């Protein structure tokens, strides 16, 4: 499957209170956030957002984003879990982390490549845990 969004403050794929298992999916996001704070704290504008106890297992996924505040994969809130295996994550833009978790979400990144280009855009960011 391919998921994409070019709208500001929107996720290409959002998993909330649900479970998803996917192989070979392509997730792309372009566009700047209207609020760097909301992007950093809640995953607004991320390509992939898993939230509110959702679980996402992605194998061989290609996740890319272009834009300020456009994080690649973001997990938010207690009980949320993301598993990325053999994934390729790339972001271009300021404040666009490769992968990020906050509010006690958990993420496992295994045998994957995470690359970022932009100011304040670490490959991995953990906040408010």
Indicate where each model-derived feature is located.
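Extracellular beta-strand/beta-solenoid scaffold signature
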Residues: 7-14, 35-49, 67-76, 92-101, ...
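A short, hydrophobic secondary-structure junction motif
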Residues: 44-62
């Amino acid at each position: 499957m391919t998921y994409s969004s070019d709208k500001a403050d929107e996720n290409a794929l959002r998993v909330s209170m649900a479970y998803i298992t996917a192989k070979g999916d392509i997730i792309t996001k372009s566009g700047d956030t209207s609020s760097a704070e909301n992007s950093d704290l809640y995953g607004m504008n991320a390509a992939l957002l898993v939230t509110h106890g959702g679980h996402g297992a992605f194998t061989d996924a290609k996740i890319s984003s272009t834009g300020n505040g456009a994080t690649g994969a973001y997990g938010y809130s207690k009980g949320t879990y993301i598993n990325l295996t053999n994934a390729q994550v790339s972001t271009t833009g300021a404040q666009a982390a490769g992968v990020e978790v906050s509010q006690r979400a958990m993420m496992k990144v295994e045998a994957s490549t995470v690359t970022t280009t932009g100011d304040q855009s670490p490959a991995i960011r953990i906040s408010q845990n």
